[in-house]
């Protein structure tokens, strides 16, 4: 099951999930991409998102407005849907309308092999890594996440040195091996690191839970601001989205 948490009042870009992407609302684009891989449900926090999904025949459920994270919203949706504890859950984003089907499939595969949860990352350049909106991740020898940060990591101490490992940009999608693990994660107390960085995935690492990271090729960009949307619409074309 794929669940897409969709919040109307995003702090940096209100109503962004309803913005038009070549004739379709953003959240509908995201759901249509997800439906190419598995059954998808949008977890809405507002009737307007719910009605939009219904208009385009996208399955949706109405959840509380008071969740602290998309993961919490996913869990409520999973409970509403009556998912069994052993059912696998993917958490995609409602602001990634350009996410490729191949990336979702890669996440699904990684989740099947991950003992706890999985996510994806892509190689980025130094200029991209400077943006705090693009989260960076560093990995251990088994391709599990060591840390996620809005800062550039790892930092080159010697300015004239060459990087021995690529910079990795996190793609904010998650796979939980089963619903029981989603329940376990949400039951953990928030930690100071996730509150400092505003990154919910740091809670898992704080409590020594493994996050497997699949490195993928992707041109997708998350839409955090109006400027992000304007830039993305210049880069992508309607034909590219009709896969």
UniProtKB/Swiss-Prot annotation:
Catalysed reactions, as listed in the record: 3-deoxy-alpha-D-manno-oct-2-ulosonate + CTP = CMP-3-deoxy-beta-D-manno-octulosonate + diphosphate
Alphabetized InterPro entries for the sequence: Cytidylyl_trans, KdsB, Nucleotide-diphossugar_trans
Presence of the UniProt keyword Transferase in the record: yes
EC number: 2.7.7.38
GO function term, MF aspect, one: 3-deoxy-manno-octulosonate cytidylyltransferase activity
Similarity comment: family membership: Belongs to the KdsB family.
Protein name as it appears in the record: 3-deoxy-manno-octulosonate cytidylyltransferase
């Amino acid at each position: 099951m794929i669940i897409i948490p969709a919040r109307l009042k995003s702090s940096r870009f209100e109503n962004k999930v309803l913005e038009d992407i070549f004739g379709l609302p953003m959240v509908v684009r995201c759901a249509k991409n997800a439906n190419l891989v598995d059954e998808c449900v949008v977890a809405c926090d507002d009737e307007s998102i719910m009605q939009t999904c219904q208009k385009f025949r996208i399955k949706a459920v109405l959840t509380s407005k008071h969740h602290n994270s998309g993961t919490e919203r996913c869990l409520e949706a999973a409970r509403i849907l009556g998912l069994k504890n052993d059912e696998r859950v993917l958490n995609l984003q409602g602001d990634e309308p350009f996410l490729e089907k191949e990336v979702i499939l890669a996440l699904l595969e990684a989740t099947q092999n991950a003992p706890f949860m999985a996510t994806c990352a892509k190689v980025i350049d130094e200029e991209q890594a400077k943006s705090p909106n693009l989260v960076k991740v560093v990995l251990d020898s088994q391709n599990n996440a060591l840390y996620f940060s809005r800062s550039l990591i790892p930092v080159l101490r010697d300015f004239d040195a060459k990087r021995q490992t690529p910079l990795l940009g996190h793609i904010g999608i998650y796979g939980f091996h089963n619903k029981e693990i989603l329940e376990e994660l949400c039951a953990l107390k928030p930690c100071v690191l996730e509150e400092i960085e505003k990154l919910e995935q740091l809670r898992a690492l704080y409590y020594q839970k493994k996050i497997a990271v699949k490195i993928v090729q992707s041109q997708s960009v998350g839409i955090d601001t109006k400027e992000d949307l304007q830039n993305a619409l210049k880069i992508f074309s309607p034909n590219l989205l009709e896969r």
